Amino acid sequence: MPSSDQNPAATPASGTAEPAPPGRPTAVSSQVLDMGAQLVQALKPVRQMKQHACSFALDAHDLRRQLEVHHLVSRLNQDVLQCAVYDSDEPSARLIGVEYIVSDTIFESLPPEEKRLWHSHAYEVKAGLRTDVGVREALQSSETARLSKTYGKFWCTWQVDRGDQLPLSAPALMVSPQATEPGRVCAELVRGRDERYRVDSSAGGLKADRVEMDEPEWINPNADYWLHGMGFAVDVVPCFFFLGR
């Protein structure tokens, strides 16, 4: 199996221009089951997703690979968020990964080798890249101020940017955009998002609204580890499984 920094072997589900996954149209019987289950099942974890945030993410081993990402956010408590990450907010959106977000206090309690898998959010927030879609800035300002002092760990399980129609190969670690190259997000990518959602993340828009926002006293140097000149890729290797009790 290839690592996350390699393309998978050619399959009918890799490297295509067609975004839809392979498969037959949903059968009527399956649709009926879905409708019936919706009436009787609580789906409690799903109903805890209260926010839709849009931002951007970069591949930790190749910062040229950049994605617009859509987080459906649920709050475990004030210091821990968990996010299902999609490639759009359309009904046909693909679940491409998961991000966990923790406060700076929790992050500082992690061992150094674990910290290296996490990224800071200060620049992403203050630059207006992250926004709660459709929510007025005045309403989301307290939340964005808190988020600027958080750290995230984002695993991408479906690398749609290379044309994969299914989740192939190992998951990829993702990082947040930063102010310095090569970690700056593509301006065209941001412009497309802004136009679609009528967001102004320019110097006269969200950036100006957030310029007075308190910044973290410091950003732990073990986060955003690519700034040290090192990325991370995931290898899947065979091993003997444990048969003990």
Placement of each model-derived feature along the sequence:
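An exposed acidic His-Trp-rich patch
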Residues: 89-185
